[in-house]
C-alpha cells in the first residue's frame, strides 16, 4: 500500500522520448488459452493488439484438444484484418509528413491540422468499435469503457491540444509531430497468429499453462522443418541446405497474458521503460499486480 501511494506515474513525454529515435526492439504477447469462450479471448486479443509498441506480435497459444472449431484462432485473424485499414492510413500519413517536413524545424499549420484530423479519426474508429460491441456482462463494459474508449479519450486530448496550438498560433516542433504520427502507427499495427502445441509430437503434452508457454518460447528464433513420423508430426531445426517450413518469431521481450485478462493502454510501454532504466540491466522479469473486474 505504501509503495502504491508513493508511486509516481512516468510522464507521457518521457515515454515518447524513450521510444523515439528509431527504437527497434520487439515484444511478443503470448496468450495461453484452454477451452475459453471465444468472446472472452477476443477481448484479450484486442487489448493486446492495441498496445502501443514499435514491433508487436500477439500469439494465441491454443491448448484445446487437437482440431478444435478454431473460433479463437479466427478472433486473432479478425483483429489483424480490422486493424489493417487504419494502420495503412496512419503509416501513409506518417511517411508523407516526414517527407514534407524534411529539414524543417516548425510544422506548418496545415500539417498540424492534418495530424489533429488523423487523431480524431483514430478516436472515432475506437469509439465506433465500442459502440457496436455487444454488451453481455460487466467485462464487456470494462472492455468498451477502459480499453477502447479509454484509449479514444487519450487520443482526443492530443487532438484538442493540436487544435488549440493552431488557434493560439503556437509553434509545434517537427519532431513532435513525427512522434505523434509514430504513436498512431504503433497503436494500430500488430501482427497476430495462433499456435497449437498438441498438433506436434515433439512438443510437451503436459497439461498445464507453463508448458503451453514453454513449448512456444523454446521454439522462438528457430528455423523449423515440419516432418511426418510414425509418432506424428514433429518440428525440428532445419539442416544445412534445407528450406524452413516455419521461421519462428524472436523478440527482445515476451509478455504473458491470461486469456481472460485485458491490458490497459501504455501497459507494454511502461513495463519495458522500467526494464530499460539505468541500473536495471540485469533485470530479466518484471511482474505487475492485476485487479479483478468490477461486478
For each predicted feature, which ranges?
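Alpha-helical membrane-embedded segments
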Residues: 1-4
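Internal catalytic domains of large membrane-associated glycosyltransferases
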Residues: 8-295
Amino acid at each position: 500500500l505504501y509503495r502504491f501511494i508513493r508511486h509516481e506515474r512516468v510522464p507521457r513525454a518521457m515515454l515518447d522520448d524513450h521510444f523515439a529515435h528509431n527504437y527497434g526492439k520487439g515484444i511478443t504477447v503470448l496468450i495461453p488459452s484452454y477451452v475459453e469462450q471465444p468472446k472472452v479471448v477476443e477481448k484479450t486479443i484486442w487489448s493486446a493488439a492495441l498496445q502501443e509498441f514499435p514491433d508487436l506480435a500477439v500469439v494465441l497459444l491454443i491448448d484445446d484438444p487437437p482440431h478444435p472449431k478454431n473460433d479463437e484462432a479466427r478472433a486473432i485473424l479478425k483483429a489483424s484484418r480490422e486493424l489493417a485499414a487504419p494502420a495503412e492510413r496512419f503509416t501513409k500519413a506518417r511517411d508523407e509528413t516526414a517527407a514534407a517536413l524534411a529539414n524543417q524545424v516548425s510544422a506548418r499549420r496545415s500539417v498540424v491540422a492534418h495530424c489533429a484530423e488523423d487523431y480524431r479519426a483514430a478516436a472515432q474508429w475506437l469509439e465506433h468499435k465500442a459502440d457496436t460491441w455487444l454488451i453481455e456482462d460487466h467485462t464487456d463494459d470494462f472492455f468498451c469503457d477502459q480499453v477502447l474508449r479509454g484509449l479514444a479519450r487519450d487520443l482526443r486530448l492530443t487532438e484538442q491540444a493540436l487544435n488549440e496550438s493552431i488557434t493560439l498560433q503556437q509553434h509545434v516542433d517537427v519532431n513532435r509531430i513525427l512522434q505523434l504520427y509514430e504513436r498512431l502507427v504503433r497503436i494500430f499495427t500488430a501482427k497476430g497468429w495462433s499456435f497449437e502445441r498438441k498438433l506436434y509430437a515433439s512438443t510437451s503434452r503436459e497439461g498445464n499453462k507453463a508448458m503451453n508457454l514453454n513449448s512456444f518460447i523454446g521454439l522462438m528464433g528457430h528455423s523449423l522443418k515440419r516432418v511426418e513420423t510414425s509418432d506424428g508430426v514433429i518440428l525440428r531445426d532445419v539442416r544445412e541446405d534445407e528450406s524452413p517450413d516455419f521461421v519462428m518469431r524472436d523478440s527482445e521481450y515476451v509478455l504473458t497474458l491470461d486469456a481472460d485478462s485485458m491490458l490497459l493502454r501504455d501497459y507494454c510501454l511502461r513495463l519495458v521503460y522500467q526494464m530499460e532504466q539505468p541500473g536495471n540491466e540485469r533485470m530479466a522479469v518484471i511482474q505487475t499486480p492485476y485487479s479483478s473486474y468490477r461486478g
